Curated annotation (Swiss-Prot):
This is Hypertrehalosaemic hormone. GO terms for molecular function: hormone activity. The modification Asparagine amide is found at N10. Its main location: secreted. Hypertrehalosaemic factors are neuropeptides that elevate the level of trehalose in the hemolymph (trehalose is the major carbohydrate in the hemolymph of insects). Belongs to the AKH/HRTH/RPCH family. The lineage of its organism: Eukaryota, Metazoa, Ecdysozoa, Arthropoda, Hexapoda.
Length: 10
């Protein structure tokens, strides 16, 4: 999950 590893897509 790219959003999860990036901090919820922030």
């Amino acid at each position: 999950q790219l959003t999860f590893s990036s901090g919820w897509g922030n």
